[in-house]
Amino acid sequence: LKDGKKVAFPCCNPDNTMTFRYVTDRNQLKERTFGISEPDDTCEECRPNNFSLLIVPGLVFDKSGYRIGYGKGFYDRFLSTFEGVSIGLCYSKLQLPEVPRGRFDRHVDVVISEKGVYAVNVPK
């Protein structure tokens, strides 16, 4: 934010979808759903494919870019139509050979840890 980059943060909606809003100042983040800081309603909404990079949270990631998240499927639903590059961040000790996955689970394209960058899927 200090460098003037356009950064969009997620908002979790009651219908279990996610939207993103541009944040220009940390004071625009307010504690909301699940106790997570989200942009306030004054922030401009960002169209889903107006950005090229998505950082995806996860508890653990596997070699194929699948993850265990927090169980609501927000990011899996969003990733199903996202056209940019998705990145998972985790410590190497949280990278497993394989994690359980369901039919709606989506993988990230790249996993980054303190030990390196792993391109696990060809970017879309």
Predicted features by range, described:
Residues 49-54, 62-66, 76-124:
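Surface-exposed, charge/polar-rich loops and edge strands
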Residues 10-12, 28-35, 61-67, 85-89:
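Short linear motifs at secondary-structure transitions and domain/linker junctions
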